[in-house]
From Swiss-Prot:
Residues 1-18 have a biased composition (Polar residues). It comes from Mus musculus. Residues 171-174 are annotated as: G3 motif. The gene is Mx2. Residues 60-333 form the Dynamin-type G domain. SUPFAM superfamilies: P-loop containing nucleoside triphosphate hydrolases. Residues 272-275 are annotated as: G5 motif. InterPro entries: Dynamin, Dynamin_GTPase, Dynamin_GTPase_CS, Dynamin_N, Dynamin_stalk, G_DYNAMIN_dom, GED, GED_dom. SMART domains: DYNc (SM00053), GED (SM00302). GO terms for molecular function: GTP binding; GTPase activity. This is Interferon-induced GTP-binding protein Mx2. Residues 567-655 form the GED domain. Residues 95-97 are annotated as: G2 motif.
Length: 655
């Protein structure tokens, strides 16, 4: 946010072109003194910004200028004319209908004046200052239409001459409140929105132009400036038309300029520029400057402002010089940070677009091989739980473990039925299947049926977990495809198609395997030594619990009945078998899912991607980029080159 070379406005403003404006020798001598001060104090900073602008850094960052705003017919154009020495369109109503960027370039002595008006793709070369006004009017009619409409499109006026300073000025449409004639009903809102886009930039010095003969408290331009610059660090008030002040109100104007009415941190200046009558009478800019000096020197109320250095265009220019120097010094560190951040951002964005696609067919094949290998490596990292993840995110395997843990808890929940429910089930089976056994003998049929029923209820939750995990893996694999192939829509689309086909097949195989496992679980079996150990552990735990019960309250009659019947024995066997079934199912189902949905899914996808290389004719088709990818990559490379050079030049700057 450095004030661009073009922002030299302040100083240069005084450097009125004698050839074009007819300045006298004394006026030119005064101007030359100011320019000497400008060269010594501001030129190094301006040269730096000029070099950045020559690099094209302005495409990436705002290099500030001076914006002139004011109510309609406040005298904005007159102030610009006085500061720059360039005659601009004038008149009543909306004169400035497009933002006008006035870029002045100082040439060496002896070089001829030249100008250029640019808008859209049109460039109009100018050979004489008198052609400027007509060219700008044509540009405004072309952009905003013939009439009173406005546009936010820029018109650029470049003026190169030995007698102008290096500076940039922006003339914005005058603020209006009521639509007139063919103006759009919301013309006022349009203009304010347009002005705000410029004056809110920290890189812009706002010159707020206010006629001396209006109540400053009601000025819309000052209110807008204060809204975007509440501390007044970038705002200078400029009072115009002091010759139109009503008699008896002069002291109020003096109070305003002395910052006693509507406070601005940077205060006010007052100038008297050429009016419409002066233009009609063909008063030259030189004569206007002389008349201004005489007016303030002889005015009984305003001459004190001249003595304070707050009146006349030369004083305004000198003030702007000082403000510009200060603003540049404040802006340089911020500009350096902006360039650094923009460089980093562009580097990160360029990485997303990857390398340029080779033109040679054989090189294209190698390029495709590299892209597919990178994709396959990322898939391998996912499967092995070694992928890189952003802060706050978790790896694929971490998410799968959460699902598997939920599955284990689902089994526990199913097996841990309430005592009363299980007691009723056991009694129901005892009544149904008990044969000739005497009390105390375990009915194996009862035991088998209860186990089978409980395990069967886990089958559908297992299938639901399979679908959940499959979707998680599919999304993860798709993200890898987007990361590697997003700019190659045919390759990305082909990968997604393969991915979906393989997913359906693997999910189907995994489901068949899980259902087969649950069919096998209907066979009640466990290794003898394992089952004995589990049963022994259950009995020991119950014995320990019984000891605690005897030391405390007496057990219920229901519990005592169980201890003396086959019910106690059945409960012990149920608990023992369920522990082993839990261990087996909670591990085996996730193993099936990992094998089919993670391992085999990944392997088949990787092989399918490598098979794409067998079709040499499809290489170019697969590597076809998005329509704007190549342009974006080129743009980012150019941007990085500009910003890298800008950083080097800033690093060498002595300030």
């Amino acid at each position: 946010m450095v004030l661009s070379t073009e922002e030299n406005t302040g100083v240069d403003s005084v450097n009125l072109p004698s050839g074009e404006t007819g300045l006298g020798e004394k006026d030119q001598e005064s101007v030359n003194n100011l320019c000497s001060q400008y060269e010594e104090k501001v030129r190094p900073c301006i040269d730096l910004i000029d070099s950045l602008r020559a690099l094209g850094v302005e495409q990436d960052l705002a290099l500030p200028a001076i914006a002139v705003i004011g109510d309609q017919s406040s005298g904005k154009s007159s102030v610009l004319e006085a500061l720059s020495g360039v005659a601009l369109p004038r008149g009543s109503g909306i004169v400035t209908r497009c933002p006008l960027v006035l870029k002045l370039r100082k040439l060496n002595e002896g070089e001829e004046w030249r100008g250029k008006v640019s808008y859209d793709d049109i460039e109009v070369e100018l050979s004489d200052p008198s052609e400027v006004e007509e060219a700008i009017n044509k540009g405004q009619n072309f952009i905003a239409g013939v009439g009173l409409g406005i546009s936010d499109k820029l018109i650029s006026l470049d003026v190169s001459s030995p007698n102008v300073p290096d500076l940039t000025l922006i003339d914005l449409p005058g603020i209006t409140r009521v639509a007139v004639g063919n103006q759009p009903a919301d013309i006022g809102r349009q203009i304010k929105r347009l002005i705000k886009t410029y004056i809110q930039k920290q890189e812009t010095i706002n010159l707020v132009v206010v006629p001396s003969n209006v109540d400053i408290a009601t000025t819309e331009a000052l209110s807008m400036a204060q809204e975007v610059d509440p501390e007044g660090d970038r705002t200078i008030g400029i009072l115009t038309k002091p010759d139109l002040v009503d008699r008896g109100t002069e002291d109020k104007v003096v109070d305003v300029v002395r910052n006693l009415v509507y406070h601005l941190k940077k205060g006010y200046m007052i100038v008297k520029c050429r009016g419409q009558q002066d233009i009609q009478e063909q008063l030259s800019l030189t004569e206007a400057l002389q008349n201004e000096q005489i007016f303030f020197k002889e005015h009984p109320h305003f001459r004190v402002l001249l003595e304070d250095g707050k009146a006349t265009v030369p004083c305004l220019a000198e003030r702007l010089t000082a403000e510009l120097i200060s603003h540049i010094c404040k802006s340089l560190p911020l500009l350096e940070n902006q360039i650094k951040e923009s460089h980093q951002s562009a580097s990160e964005e360029l990485q997303k677009y990857g390398m340029d696609i080779p033109e040679d067919d054989s090189e294209k094949t190698f390029f495709l091989i590299e892209k597919i290998n990178a994709f396959n490596q990322d898939i391998t990292a996912l499967v092995q739980g070694e992928e890189n993840v952003a802060e706050g995110e978790c790896r694929l395997f971490t998410r799968l473990r959460k699902e598997f843990l939920s599955w284990s808890k689902e089994i526990e929940k199913n097996f841990a039925k309430g005592y009363a429910v299980l007691y009723n089930e056991v009694w129901a089976f005892e009544k149904q299947y008990r044969g000739r056994e005497l009390p105390g003998f375990v009915n194996y049929k009862t035991f088998e049926n209860i186990i089978r029923r409980q395990i069967k209820t886990l089958e559908e939750p297992a299938i639901e977990m399979l679908h959940t995990v499959t979707e998680i893996v599919r999304a993860a694999f798709t993200s890898v495809s987007e990361k590697n192939f997003s700019e190659f829509y045919n390759l990305h689309r082909t990968t997604k198609s393969k991915l979906e086909d393989i997913r359906l097949e693997q999910e189907k195989e995994a489901e068949m395997s899980i259902r087969l496992h649950f069919k096998m679980e209907q066979i009640i079996y466990c290794q003898d030594q394992i089952y004995r150990g589990a049963l022994q552990k259950v009995r020991e735990e119950e014995a320990e619990e019984e000891k605690k019960t005897k030391h405390g309250t007496s057990s219920s009659s229901q519990s005592q009945d169980l201890q003396t019947s086959s019910m106690a024995e059945i409960f012990q066997h149920l608990n023992a078998y369920r522990q082993e079934a839990h261990n087996r199912i909670s591990s085996h189902v996730p193993l099936i899912i990992q094998y089919f949905i993670l391992k085999m899914f990944a392997e088949r996808l990787q092989k399918g991607m490598l098979q794409l290389l067998q079709d040499k004719d499809s290489c170019s088709w697969l590597l076809k980029e998005q329509s704007d990818t190549s342009e974006k990559r080129k743009f980012l490379k150019e941007r990085l080159a500009r910003l890298a050079q800008a950083r080097r030049r800033l690093a060498k700057f002595p300030g």
